[in-house]
């Protein structure tokens, strides 16, 4: 078997496309047959103990169970290597190929990846600009929560509205909506009763976005019945329908750009998306109930001649019109309202969609009935992962990035109340400030996702799975135990559920089963895929036969015992050690205390080489003997080796890149690693028994990277948010406060005079003064303006002393300054001396 070694600088992780998943598993046999799809849920034959063909352990897909032996037994020798059996189709090769050959499952119905629908933040919600998407994208995968009782039982089969509805169905529905329906519908119908000359004279534009296609429909009333007495006008169905058609209410061929209209508008605050629509359909409700039945029939028949870009759009729009005519609570605020709100948020995004969702208008006290018949018009492809996939496919990543960037700039200007944006968009004042900040943060998260998708060349629609990869069988083994029993991986059970439900869904579609059963099967398929990817992510944990949680793919790779931390990051390596950490406040940020015994063992090869170079030993054996005897000549050589060789310190778990940092080692006694307390926050370490690992960089390149990139002082800012990560802790702040306190009186050695900082430290070490003793120290560097003059003392040599509140200045007879003393405390001297020593300010 050929093996190739390739050098690479980095690994690029991205979404896998359906084509890439097929490339992982699809292979073509010499007879022209394509293999790779797992079609059966069986694993092995319990009589022959051989893998089932096209099953989860199929030898034709994943390779032979025994090296150079086909499934049927026709070929068994190594001389047939590379041959494909013409009887069973198994390639004669080594059995270890079962560790990397993959298969796939063609899903009958697309399913959403649970990592992106139930994540925090919700990636699909950010991409589609739908708030609270995690509540909408549940296992039934209805992106629109209709909030209607019994919706799952009512939506049975899609019915084309363009077809002629049975009269019996229309009669039954109209009896429902017309029951107790008065001629005067709402307050607006009082005008009808009073025979007003002009009901409305108003020009407005109403934008109604519909879900499945990128088309906006404009409903217009232009010069509505100007100065016309409604009582003198014919009220026949023909008049109503002709009026609706003439006024272009039913014109479905008027797509407009809502974004452009709002941008061009001089006063966006006047755009009303609710009341004008209600006014239109309240007008329809002013006609007597006996005319509704005929009006409905005419609308349905006329729909055959209505031009539309797509039959689906026509169906939804006419259904919406029927809802409004019904003036029902659920019809007005049910399906149509959710369609409108979702499309508005999707098309306009956060730029023009109100930051505070529009509340549903209040209705009058009436009896409402659920229009079950109209609910059945909802096509099956308007719900589920198919719809989400369609919306994600329509995303133009480059345009979305540009639009989101503009919104972030505009939102920032509004939050800072910059002119003229803030005053031009007066309607922003109605929005809650916290919500504005929240949406700007969401836009920032969204642009990060979009830029990552663009950089990796990924399509967001790949978050919806149409082809499910099957990992190699050697990674999910089935082992035979004593007594004929088998121990198998949980992944086999999870894959078996998916294949079983997928095949059952295919069978239901072939026999044209009721939609209720098909939808339930789609839900079960989605749940099975969710459990395979991440069991428990949805909230419900799938259990095995003995009530044990099944181990999913996510459980295998995450956690302390997962593949990364257990087998990759936690491997034992050479030139490494481990010990408990203790505090070392006297160290610098770039230093750490390395125990002598550990340094002697870790740096032994470097130590031997240096001893040979200095002539202390003639060969490795003599040098090793000197080290074992712990001769005194070893110490200076070891210090020289350590002076130019950094080390890595790592604390598990390594959750971010600051979990591994470089330090310059300092030899210390004992067996514990000393660490500066300020660098503990990056490691998330404390001194209650934590352990850290030491690693030695061997090559010159790695050592140069330590000095240039990974030293602790160079990791001052957090890579996550740019905030300082090296900050003084509470005990440090309290210690600095206690060190510099100056209001304690009556202490040992008060009011003594000192010539320098070193004299103060010497007196403190000899216990002649205390930490908070008030002292006078000579100060000669810079002139300080004295304050609060108290008195002046004349001396015999004509000089005099000026005494201030915290200063004493001695001057000669001409007024020239001879010397000055500052009043301070011993603790402040220690603090000042430490700072100057660290900054190399002392001469």
From Swiss-Prot:
GO terms under cellular component: chloroplast; DNA-directed RNA polymerase complex; mitochondrion
Cofactor(s) needed by this chain: Mg(2+); Zn(2+)
Domain of life: Eukaryota
Record flagged with keyword Transmembrane: no
Catalytic activity: RNA(n) + a ribonucleoside 5'-triphosphate = RNA(n+1) + diphosphate
Amino-acid positions noted as binding Mg(2+) in the UniProt annotation, renumbered to this chain: 686, 688, 690
E.C. code: 2.7.7.6
Keyword hit for Magnesium: yes
GO molecular function terms attached to this record: DNA binding; DNA-directed RNA polymerase activity; magnesium ion binding; zinc ion binding
Record InterPro entries: DNA-dir_RpoC_beta_prime, RNA_pol_asu, RNA_pol_N, RNA_pol_Rpb1_1, RNA_pol_Rpb1_3, RNA_pol_Rpb1_3_sf, RNA_pol_Rpb1_clamp_domain, RNApol_RpoC1
Entry keyword set: Chloroplast, DNA-directed RNA polymerase, Magnesium, Metal-binding, Nucleotidyltransferase, Plastid, Transcription, Transferase, Zinc
Protein's cellular compartments: Plastid, Chloroplast
A GO BP annotation: DNA-templated transcription
Entry note: cofactor: Binds 1 Mg(2+) ion per subunit.
Coiled coil, from the record: none
Stored SUPFAM superfamilies: beta and beta-prime subunits of DNA dependent RNA-polymerase
Role: DNA-dependent RNA polymerase catalyzes the transcription of DNA into RNA using the four ribonucleoside triphosphates as substrates.
PANTHER family in UniProt: DNA-DIRECTED RNA POLYMERASE, DNA-DIRECTED RNA POLYMERASE SUBUNIT BETA
Family, as annotated: Belongs to the RNA polymerase beta' chain family. RpoC1 subfamily.
This protein's name: DNA-directed RNA polymerase subunit beta'
Organism: Trieres chinensis
């Amino acid at each position: 078997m050929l093996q190739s070694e390739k050098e690479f600088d980095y690994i690029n992780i991205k979404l896998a496309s359906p084509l890439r998943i097929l490339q992982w598993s699809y292979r073509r046999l010499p007879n022209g047959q394509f293999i790779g799809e797992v079609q059966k849920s069986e694993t092995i034959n319990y009589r022959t103990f051989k893998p089932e063909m096209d099953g989860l352990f199929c030898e034709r897909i994943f390779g032979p169970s025994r090296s150079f032996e086909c499934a049927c037994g026709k070929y068994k020798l190594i001389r047939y290597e590379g041959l494909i059996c013409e009887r069973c189709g198994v390639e004669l090769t080594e059995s270890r190929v079962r560790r990397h050959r993959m298969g796939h499952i063609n899903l009958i119905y697309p399913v959403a990846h649970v990592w992106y629908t139930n994540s925090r933040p919700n990636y699909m919600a950010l991409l589609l600009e739908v708030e609270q998407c995690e509540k909408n994208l549940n296992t039934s995968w209805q992106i629109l929560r209709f909030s209607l009782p019994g919706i799952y039982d009512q939506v049975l089969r899609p019915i084309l509205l363009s077809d002629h509805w049975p009269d019996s169905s229309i009669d039954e529905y109209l009896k429902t909506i017309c029951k107790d329906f008065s001629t005067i519908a709402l307050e607006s119908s009082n005008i009808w009763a009073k025979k007003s000359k002009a009901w409305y004279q108003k020009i407005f534009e109403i934008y109604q976005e519909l879900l499945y296609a990128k088309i906006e429909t404009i409903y217009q009333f232009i010069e509505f019945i100007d100065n016309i007495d409604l009582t003198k006008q014919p009220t026949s169905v023909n008049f109503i329908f002709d009026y609706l058609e003439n006024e272009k209410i039913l014109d479905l061929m008027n797509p407009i750009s809502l974004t452009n209209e709002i941008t061009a508008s001089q006063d966006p605050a006047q755009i009303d998306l609710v009341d004008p629509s209600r006014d239109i359909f309240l007008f329809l409700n002013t006609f007597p109930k006996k005319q509704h039945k005929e009006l409905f029939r005419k609308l349905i028949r006329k729909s055959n001649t209505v031009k539309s870009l797509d039959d689906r759009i026509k169906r939804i729009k006419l259904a919406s019109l029927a809802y409004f005519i019904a003036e029902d609570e659920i019809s007005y605020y049910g399906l149509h309202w959710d369609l409108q709100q979702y499309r508005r948020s999707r098309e306009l995004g956060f730029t023009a969609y109100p930051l505070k969702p529009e509340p549903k208008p209040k209705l009058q006290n009436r009896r409402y009935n659920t229009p079950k018949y109209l609910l059945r018009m909802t096509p099956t492809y308007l719900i589920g992962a198919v719809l989400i996939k369609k919306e994600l496919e329509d995303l133009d990543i480059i345009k979305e990035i540009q639009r989101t960037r503009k919104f972030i700039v505009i939102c920032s200007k509004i939050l800072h109340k910059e002119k003229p944006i803030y005053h031009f968009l007066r309607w922003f004042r109605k929005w809650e400030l916290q919500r504005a900040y929240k949406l700007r943060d969401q836009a920032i998260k969204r642009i990060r996702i979009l830029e990552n998708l663009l950089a990796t060349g990924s399509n967001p629609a790949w978050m919806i799975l149409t082809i499910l990869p099957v990992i190699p069988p050697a990674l999910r083994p089935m082992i035979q135990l004593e007594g004929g029993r088998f121990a198998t991986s949980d992944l086999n059970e999870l894959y078996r559920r998916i294949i079983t439900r997928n095949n059952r869904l295919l069978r239901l579609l072939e026999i044209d089963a009721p939609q209720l059963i098909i939808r339930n099967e789609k839900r079960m398929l989605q749940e099975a895929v969710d459990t395979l990817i991440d069991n428990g992510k949805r909230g419900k944990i799938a259990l095995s036969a003995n009530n044990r949680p099944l181990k999913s793919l996510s459980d295998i790779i995450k956690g302390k015992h997962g593949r990364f931390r257990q087998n990759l990051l936690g491997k034992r390596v050479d030139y490494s050690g481990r010990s408990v950490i203790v505090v070392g406040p006297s160290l610098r940020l770039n230093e750490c205390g390395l125990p002598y015994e550990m340094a002697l063992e870790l740096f032994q090869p470097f130590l031997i080489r240096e001893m040979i170079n200095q002539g202390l030993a003639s060969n490795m054996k003599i040098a090793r003997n000197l080290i074992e005897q712990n001769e005194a000549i070893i110490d200076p050589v070891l210090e020289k080796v350590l002076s130019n060789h950094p080390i890595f310190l790592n604390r598990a778990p390594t959750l971010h890149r600051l979990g591994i940092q470089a330090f310059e080692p300092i030899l210390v006694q004992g067996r514990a690693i000393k660490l500066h307390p300020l660098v503990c926050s990056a490691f998330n370490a404390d001194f209650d028994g934590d352990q850290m690992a030491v690693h030695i960089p061997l090559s010159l390149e790695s050592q140069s990277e330590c000095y240039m990139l990974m030293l602790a002082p160079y990791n001052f800012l957090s890579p996550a948010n740019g905030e300082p990560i090296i900050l003084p802790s509470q005990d440090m702040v309290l210690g600095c406060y206690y060190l510099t306190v100056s209001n304690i009186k009556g202490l040992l050695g008060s009011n003594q005079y000192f010539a320098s900082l070193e004299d103060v430290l010497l007196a403190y070490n000899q216990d002649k003064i205390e930490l908070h003793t008030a002292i006078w120290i000579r100060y000669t560097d810079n002139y300080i303006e004295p304050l609060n003059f108290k008195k002046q003392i004349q001396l015999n040599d004509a000089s005099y002393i000026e005494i201030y509140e915290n200063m004493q200045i001695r001057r000669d007879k001409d007024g020239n300054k001879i010397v000055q003393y500052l009043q301070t405390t011993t603790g402040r001297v220690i603090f000042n001396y430490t700072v100057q020593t660290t900054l190399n300010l002392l001469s």
